[in-house]
Amino acid sequence: AAYLVRDANFDGHNIHILESMDVLGGSNDGAGSVQQGFVCRGGRMLNEETYENFWELFRSIPSLEQPQRSVTEEILNFDHAHPTCAHARLIDKDAKILDVRSMGFDNADRLAMTKLLLTPEERLDNMTIEDWFGPHFFETNFWYMWQTTFAFQKWSSLFEFRRYMNRMIFEFPRIETLEGVTRTPYNQYESVILPLKAYLETNGVRFETGRTVTDIDFAPGEALTATALHFSDGCAVDLRE
């Protein structure tokens, strides 16, 4: 929606965003209150060096607290002033901080990792991480840090693991402190989703929450032209050209 409004000069009044939940944001949603607490189900592991599209888009979105600045400026200024620096990436069962300055790889792990990064993604379909790496890999400091940072399991998709490796390769030298992770001033719902929502609303975009689409009617013919939306509450909306 933001690209349509900003780059294509699309009339925002003709954009309707439907959300089945009662709160916007998808996996970056956030809800709650000071009294009852907040629930934020997920967030993006932002990185200044590699999230070019994200930073470019949010240079166009004004900050809610500092409208003269963009969201990109607000986030990067905050992160530079308050960089991430974890001192206890891994602890043992006795709450002792472990030394993670070494990745813990052996030569077989290094060879498998190099081979993975050089292998085309189409060859990795239907493979798990455990299919590629030997048992020793899953006992390394690297695996424990990477797993807990990105929620990987041994049975997770191998090509998804490879994508994360390529995207976050800059984190290798600093994964023991997470210094490369870009922090937002507040949770990402408040620092990212709400400013974007405000920008879209200012340009006429309409949001409807609690709306689940269960079926779509299409016009006859080879072209895919939707003519109506059906919702879980039994209502239907006809679509116009």
Predicted feature descriptions by range:
Residues A1, E19-S20, Y51, N203:
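Conserved beta-strand->loop/alpha-helix structural units within folded catalytic cores of enzymes
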Residues A2-R6, A198:
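Short, well-ordered alpha-helices that flank and scaffold nucleotide-derived cofactor binding pockets
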Residues V5-G32:
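Glycine-rich FAD pyrophosphate-binding loop
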Residues Q36-I75:
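Conserved FAD-binding subdomain of flavin-dependent enzymes
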Residues C40-L46, L116-P120, L178-N187:
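Active-site rim elements
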Residues N53-S60, T128, W132, M145, ...:
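Amphipathic alpha-helical segments that form well-ordered structural scaffolds
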Residues S63-R167:
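Rossmann-like flavin
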Residues R167-E241:
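Helical element adjacent to the flavin cofactor pocket in flavoenzyme catalytic cores
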